């Protein structure tokens, strides 16, 4: 599943070190907001979790995604996640426009 992820400036998130182009794997039980590898289906939602001045933003491929979803944004939790490309804020905005177009069938 295509999704979007924020990390800190060192490409870490909740103790997990990510490497561009490599697949991160979580071995435990998944729990949204508590355990697993997290990202957002809707690009702009990433800003709810990672402030622009201290973060990096990526397009990711998530596998082993739980059916669990939050009520306040499009956050997902997965067993495997690969950072495909660093896109920054301009990439998030562009991806958000494409996301909306897809949702409305444009």
Residue map of PLM features:
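Short, glycine-biased loop/turn motifs at secondary-structure junctions and
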Residues: 1-106
């Amino acid at each position: 599943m295509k999704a979007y992820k924020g990390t800190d400036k060192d490409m870490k998130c909740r103790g997990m070190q990510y490497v561009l182009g490599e697949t991160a794997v979580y071995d435990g039980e998944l729990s949204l907001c508590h355990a697993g590898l997290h990202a957002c289906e809707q690009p702009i939602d990433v800003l709810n979790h990672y402030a622009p001045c201290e973060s990096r933003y990526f397009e990711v491929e998530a596998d082993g995604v739980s059916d669990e979803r939050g009520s306040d944004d499009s956050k997902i939790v997965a067993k495997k996640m690969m950072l495909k490309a660093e896109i920054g804020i301009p990439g998030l905005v562009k991806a958000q426009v494409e996301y909306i177009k897809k949702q409305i069938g444009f």
